[in-house]
Amino acid sequence: MVKLAKAGKNQGDPKKMAPPPKEVEEDSEDEEMSEDEEDDSSGEEVVIPQKKGKKAAATSAKKVVVSPTKKVAVATPAKKAAVTPGKKAAATPAKKTVTPAKAVTTPGKKGATPGKALVATPGKKGAAIPAKGAKNGKNAKKEDSDEEEDDDSEEDEEDDEDEDEDEDEIEPAAMKAAAAAPASEDEDDEDDEDDEDDDDDEEDDSEEEAMETTPAKGKKAAKVVPVKAKNVAEDEDEEEDDEDEDDDDDEDDEDDDDEDDEEEEEEEEEEPVKEAPGKRKKEMAKQKAAPEAKKQKVEGTEPTTAFNLFVGNLNFNKSAPELKTGISDVFAKNDLAVVDVRIGMTRKFGYVDFESAEDLEKALELTGLKVFGNEIKLEKPKGKDSKKERDARTLLAKNLPYKVTQDELKEVFEDAAEIRLVSKDGKSKGIAYIEFKTEADAEKTFEEKQGTEIDGRSISLYYTGEKGQNQDYRGGKNSTWSGESKTLVLSNLSYSATEETLQEVFEKATFIKVPQNQNGKSKGYAFIEFASFEDAKEALNSCNKREIEGRAIRLELQGPRGSPNARSQPSKTLFVKGLSEDTTEETLKESFDGSVRARIVTDRETGSSKGFGFVDFNSEEDAKAAKEAMEDGEIDGNKVTLDWAKPKGEGGFGGRGGGRGGFGGRGGGRGGRGGFGGRGRGGFGGRGGFRGGRGGGGDHKPQGKKTKFE
């Protein structure tokens, strides 16, 4: 301590304070470095009661004192010189020696003697030591306020001690980060140093305890956050004036406490977040279990019969047994025997099972029935009929006039339950699906209405679904050909020929169909059906190439899907033949729903259409649907024939062999090697060769067009 006094005398002018702290630093390294920090905090109270006239000296003294605990980046060299020893004293071997020093300096908080008092003596010319006893005028008032601040600071220290105890559990790496953080507070305001130096005493003590104990590894390093928050607050406080020292110190302490409280609350809030995944799993399990309980929407299991009726608008205020009894009584009054009644879980709807289809049809005809004051709604269950059942009672009508309406079709098909016209972009495609109530009604209509004329056009009827695949032309879709077809396909027919003309030629024919264009004229072909395969074969042998109205007809037995050479493998592309020369690719594409591209094959020399083309689709399903809809349809007045196009790579001619080798160049020397075959044209021979090398083999990829070389 004597050396410290000498250093104070050698300082003289307050502005030249740099050298003495270095001496103090060197001496303190040999002694106990943490003792300086404790003396500094106690020496603050000696410097504060100075007069305003001596403010410069007091400030410089503070700079010397604060430097051991903080690495302040102010131009004063004394701070930088005194930082390292303070850190070493707090971090390494000084732990054990600092402990007794604490007992010495603790009462020195109000005694105001060592450390800082000795350093500040030259600035005050000896007035700093008895400053505590000389309470006069303004200085006395400041002393009183300082004592109050000490009380406040002691309360703050208690809060800080709680924080420091938490910091004891931080890992070594976190301890280093926490020690480096206050060292980075280079621009701390001098106003904060009064309270902070007092806090440093407690922090040093807590750090010493922390270094002697093993840190808890499980503790999170997130506790270092308060230091960063404090740095921000202290950087903002630097902009405050020196005259507001006391107020700023109090506010900083309060802010630090508030931040600590907020951080503790945040940590408490973080804990439930960790538990969230577990809770979510439980909730997810509950959510998954919930739908299973709701699957049973209708009381009872499966329908007892195949004849079911949906009953809606029930009085849900009644119980399920009451509703069952009420519904059964209503149908019993109308002479309808009910097999079973199933009520929905909401009791707003239900299903009634009948013994027969006749009872079901009678029930559907009933109107105005009331059950417990509610007029019930009766209809067939939606989705109950399978596609197979609907197809069995549905007919496909083709070659319809484009301007035909549903009302006009209803007049023709009186027994139809539903009529659906097929259109694209608001324009009719001349096709309609006609659904009947029963399969028997569909079969009856098929026999009676086949070939019926509507606005001058003879319509064609086809079954849909599996039933349509097992019938010949009269059913629209032809059966898988067995080799014994009863139908002949007649082509190259005169456009003026009629069904009556053909009936005279084919006397044994049971059905004759001559498709017509929009003008009511023949399209140049016909279908002739006989009672047996033998009759059809006899007509084929006797009438093939016979002239009818000036044209020699051609006959052939109808094969699968209307063509003897039909392709059996579906694909994404349809082959369309029988096109008009005026048909464009755009028209061809628009004629098929779902098509993505269409191309018409043209003659290379004339550029005119060859009468056939291809239509591409995104999937085989789209191609099948379009083929079904356009089977035996028309495009620009011409009857077209559809077939599956073979995928690229199937059949066809094999690729050419490799090109021949190039010729040798002029002049002497050796010729280069010939080109390799299979990839385009052959290569050139090298210059000066007698002859070119041989061409490649012919087992490579097909070669492109030949190219002649001069």
Curated annotation (Swiss-Prot):
Covalent link location (Glycyl lysine isopeptide (Lys-Gly) (interchain with G-Cter in SUMO2)): K297, K324, K370, K377, K513, K577, K589, K624
Residue stretches of biased makeup (Gly residues): 650-696
SUPFAM superfamilies: RNA-binding domain, RBD
Bias kind Basic and acidic residues: ranges: 273-300, 697-710
Keywords on record: Acetylation, Cytoplasm, DNA-binding, Isopeptide bond, Methylation, Nucleus, Phosphoprotein, Repeat, RNA-binding, Ubl conjugation
Region (8 X 8 AA tandem repeats of X-T-P-X-K-K-X-X): 58-135
Stretches for region Disordered: 1-303, 640-710
Sequence repeats: 58-65, 75-82, 83-90, 91-98, 99-104, 105-112, 120-127, 128-135
Modified positions (Omega-N-methylarginine) in chain numbering: R694
Positions of post-translational N6-acetyllysine modification: 9, 15-16, 96, 102, 109, 116, 124, 318, 348, 377, 398, 403, 427, 444, 467, 477, 513, 521, 572, 577, 646
Bias (Acidic residues) ranges: 24-43, 145-171, 184-211, 234-272
Entry-annotated residues carrying Phosphoserine: 28, 34, 41-42, 67, 145, 153, 184, 206, 356, 458, 460, 563, 580, 591, 619
Asymmetric dimethylarginine carried by residues: R656, R660, R666, R670, R673, R679, R681, R687, R691, R694
Record note on modification: Some glutamate residues are glycylated by TTLL8. This modification occurs exclusively on glutamate residues and results in a glycine chain on the gamma-carboxyl group.
Positions of crosslink type Glycyl lysine isopeptide (Lys-Gly) (interchain with G-Cter in SUMO1): K297, K324, K589
Residue ranges constituting the RRM domain according to the UniProt record: 307-383, 393-466, 486-560, 572-647
Main location group: nucleus
Compositional bias per record (Low complexity), positions renumbered to this chain: 56-107, 122-137, 172-183
Residues with the Phosphothreonine modification: T69, T76, T84, T92, T99, T106, T113, T121, T214, T301, T367, T405
The keyword Phosphoprotein belongs to this UniProt entry's keyword annotation: yes
Self-association state and partner proteins as the record states: Identified in a IGF2BP1-dependent mRNP granule complex containing untranslated mRNAs. Component of the SWAP complex that consists of NPM1, NCL/nucleolin, PARP1 and SWAP70. Component of a complex which is at least composed of HTATSF1/Tat-SF1, the P-TEFb complex components CDK9 and CCNT1, RNA polymerase II, SUPT5H, and NCL/nucleolin. Interacts with AICDA. Interacts with APTX. Interacts with C1QBP. Interacts with ERBB4. Interacts (via C-terminus) with FMR1 isoform 6 (via N-terminus). Interacts with GZF1; this interaction is important for nucleolar localization of GZF1. Interacts with NSUN2.
Protein role: Nucleolin is the major nucleolar protein of growing eukaryotic cells. It is found associated with intranucleolar chromatin and pre-ribosomal particles. It induces chromatin decondensation by binding to histone H1. It is thought to play a role in pre-rRNA transcription and ribosome assembly. May play a role in the process of transcriptional elongation. Binds RNA oligonucleotides with 5'-UUAGGG-3' repeats more tightly than the telomeric single-stranded DNA 5'-TTAGGG-3' repeats.
The protein, known as: Nucleolin
Organism: Homo sapiens (Human)
Phylogenetic classification of the source organism: Eukaryota, Metazoa, Chordata, Craniata, Vertebrata
Gene: NCL
